Structures are given as C-alpha cells and as structure tokens.
Amino acid sequence: MRCPYCGSLETQVKDSRPTDDASAIRRRRVCPDCGGRFTTFERVQLRELTVLKKSGRRAPFEREKLMRSLEIALRKRPVEPERVERMVNGIVRQLESQGESEIASDRIGELVMEGLRALDSVAYVRFASVYRNFREARDFNALIDELDGAAQPEAPSKDDGGTDEPPAKTRAPTRA
C-alpha cells in the first residue's frame, strides 16, 4: 500500500481488526521510510457499481463520495459516526444486492433521503435542499410540512368534531 505522506510503496501493517459491525477490516499501517502512520479499511465488494448520472454520463460508484455528502449534511449534528457508517453500509448493500451494475443517481439520492429522514431531520432537510435543488423558501416549507405531517398523530375524524381543514400551523416568518 502506498504511503499517503511520502509515496513509498513499502508500508507495514501494525494492527488489524474487524470493524464494530464486521463489515470491514481496519488496518493500522506505518511507513518505514518516513514513519508516517495511517489507517486503511478493507471491504468486500460484491460487484463494480456504475452511477448513471442525470446527464447520461456514467461514473464509478464512490463510497467515499457518499460518505462525504452525508458528513456535509450532518455537520455539527449530534449523530454518532458509527450510525452514519451503518447507514452507508446499508445503502451500499442495497445497491449491490439489486443485481444491477448500473444505478441511477436518483436511486442513490432516494436511499440517502430515506436514511437521513430516520437518522436526523435537520440533516434530511439540508440534504434535500441540495438534492432537490431548492430555489425558494417555500420549497423548504413544503418539505418541513411533509416531515411534520409524517410525525403528527392521526387527525381527528369528522365524528370527533374534526373538519376537512388541515390544522393551522404557526411558523415564524421566513426571509426570502
């Protein structure tokens, strides 16, 4: 394995152990040339996945790119890295087990949205704003209303004195 510090091809494994969820092997390495220490992860790859972009272009699937986009959405949020890792592992497993070598970028985005919705609602809104290309404040309001609707208990029926009108929402004014 090439040393990320000096480029030497001679590195030594000092420690090797499975990750907590046993989906990868974590190896601690040292470079004898510069003394640099770094960690690598070895994972099973069931198949080479290709992402079919909206433009029609094809690109190799990059697990690290998926992880980076989640880290951006989850920045400064109280979510343990292990939960994010489990989510990414689950998404990759779903993609690999679909039996297709080409996956539409939309499918990946929907899986991420699904996972973030269960993980952290703020990160979900952050990711959705980029993924769905929000242009105005009302785009955020619609998504938040959708989130609120999924989290609210069932509305009272007409027999209970309820109406067909949705409950009034009080929200601070938004700045456009």
From Swiss-Prot:
Function, in words: Negatively regulates transcription of bacterial ribonucleotide reductase nrd genes and operons by binding to NrdR-boxes.
One Pfam family from the record: ATP-cone
Co-factor requirement: Zn(2+)
Protein's name according to its UniProt entry: Transcriptional repressor NrdR
Zinc finger (unnamed): 3-34
GO molecular function list: ATP binding; DNA binding; zinc ion binding
Family: Belongs to the NrdR family.
Domain of life: Bacteria
Keyword Zinc belongs to the record: yes
Organism placement in taxonomy: Bacteria, Pseudomonadati, Pseudomonadota, Alphaproteobacteria, Hyphomicrobiales
Assigned keywords, A-Z: ATP-binding, DNA-binding, Metal-binding, Nucleotide-binding, Repressor, Transcription, Transcription regulation, Zinc, Zinc-finger
Binding note for cofactor: Binds 1 zinc ion.
Keyword match DNA-binding: yes
Originating organism: Methylocella silvestris (strain DSM 15510 / CIP 108128 / LMG 27833 / NCIMB 13906 / BL2)
GO terms (BP aspect): negative regulation of DNA-templated transcription
Residue ranges annotated for the ATP-cone domain, each copy included: 49-139
Residue segments, region Disordered: 147-176
